[in-house]
C-alpha cells in the first residue's frame, strides 16, 4: 500500500511547492498493529520514498537536494522513522491507560500526523530556514517562523483529521480482525 501511495499522486497531494502526505496513515496503522519497531520500519519506507521524490520530479525536494543533499536526507528519513517509532510507543503507552481500548487508536492516528508535520517542518527550518529559497517562499515578508506555523496549520488541518479517522478506524478494525482470527485458530 505504501509503495502504491508513494509512486502515484495518491500519497503526496501537491499544494503549491509543498505536499500534503497521506503516507502517515499506513505508518501509524502499522505502528499500532506491529509496535514501535514495525512503525519505525514503515516510517523508514515513508522516509526513503519521500527522499526518492526529491530526485523524481518534486520541485521542492529537488531544490533542497541541490542546496544540500545531506540535509535533505535528514529532513526526509530520520523524521519519518522517528514518527513511526514514536507512534508505536505512544500507542503502547496509551493502551495501558485507555479503559475503552478505542480512544487509543484515534489519538495515536492524530498524534502520528502531528509528529510528522512537527518533525519535518522543524528539521526543514533548522536545515534550510536560512536559505534564500525558503526565505523567498515567505511571500508576505513576515517572519519565516510564522510562515512555517501557517503552513503547519494548513497541513495539520488536512493530515491530522484524516490520519485520526482513517488511521484510527482501520487500525481498530484490523486489530479486532486479528484477535478474531487468533481466537479461531486456537479452537
Which ranges hold each PLM region?
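Loop-helix junctions at membrane interfaces
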Residues: 1-187
